[in-house]
Amino acid sequence: MNESFSAFVRVLTAVLWGPHVLLLILLAGVWFTLRGRFMQVTKLPGMTRGALCGTQRCGGFSAFQSLTASLAGSLGTGNILGVAAAILVGGAGAVVWMWIAAFFGMMTVYAEGVLAAKFGTKNAPGAIGYVQKAFGRHGAKIYAAGCVLSALGMGTMAQTGAASSVLVPMGVPRVLAGVVFAGLLLLCVRGGLPKAVRVTEKLVPFMAGLFLALCAAVLLLRGSHIPGAVRNMLKGAFSLKAGAGGVCGMILAMRESISRGVFTNEAGLGSGTFATFRTENKTPEQIGTLGALQVFIDTILLCTITALCMLVSPVRDFSPEAALSVFSLVLGRFGKLSAGVCVALFAFASVLAWSCYGMDALLYLLPKKGAAEKRIYMAFTALSCFLGCMSPFLGVLNVCDAFNGLMALLNVPALLVLTPQVFAKQIAQKPKKV
């Protein structure tokens, strides 16, 4: 029975989250890059200032709150453990594949943000709004169901499972880790996304700053090895090893490994739009810019710095379980403990954001949207946190990969169908030929 179920899960995952889906996501990014005339190079840097300035809001979120909330969802354990897995499988050259995927992914997430701002509503929030516009209510319901299942699996169980695998060797019992994660989640998410955003706007800068400080210390102490690390990254980018391990290098950046399925910038899933579409006093184009900035910070900045730390360190075992040894060998016990805290914070931030995304999606599916339904959902989310810490089951996580694929297979085609809406302002401003 178990073997039959495992075989079914493998087939389901291969269909919904195989290389063809990752290729679809990457090609969508290429398409939007060409349609936008490489906006992520020519226009987005200048648009970022306008997108971030101003903090006034009337019931919605400020631009900074939206950015930190979307970063909370994407800055999971994959930013540390996932990068280690990428290098383990694809060598130093896999980092370049992550850059390529992120470069095109910036425009995919830009398109998601623009369309969510145009079509997202209170009753059909975020990506659900534009999926409904493209494929009707039935298509939107399938997408929302995938989002709920991904929130319970990848957004909670996979994150806490990966975090516990790091915390347990440091002396933290699995039960204690599970209880703390679940308890903090229930405490922070009782008010829904608005309350969660007030947490993430403080938590994300703190945890990112702490992690960057650790990485800076490693790079300062091992600075003489940086040129060699960069050289290895560029030389290995198109080697057979990097190609085999990093084909559609996105898979290496998005997932820590098959056993943990931890993703990073979430380009193609539409998940970050649940936070960004609520941004007050911003145009759709500015909201799209926030999404593109999220991908840049997540992958181009943080994942690259993580990779450099690993490549300049004396560590040669880049398995996720040994990832923190990079910090312990260079910075001692303090470095390992601090890195462990970062992993726990990254995991919790992702759990907090995804639990709210899942709640929004669930409320779209339910005809009755009462407090009881919210409490039941949060109980299941807390249970998922606890179970993830206790035992990160491979079969469950493979199913979660399939849920991600379910989201992408509806989200990306919806983006392509609505492409004219993404660049409507750009087309309108194009001067007519006389």
Predicted features and spans:
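N-terminal alpha-helical transmembrane segments of multi-pass membrane transport
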Residues: 1-77, 88-93, 105, 220, ...
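Membrane-interface loop-to-helix entry segments
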Residues: 24-35, 39-48, 161-167, 172-222, ...
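Alpha-helical membrane segments and immediately flanking helix-loop junctions
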Residues: 57-89, 122-128, 148, 247-296, ...
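Membrane-interface helix-loop-helix modules in multi-pass membrane proteins
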Residues: 65-124, 132-136, 288-315
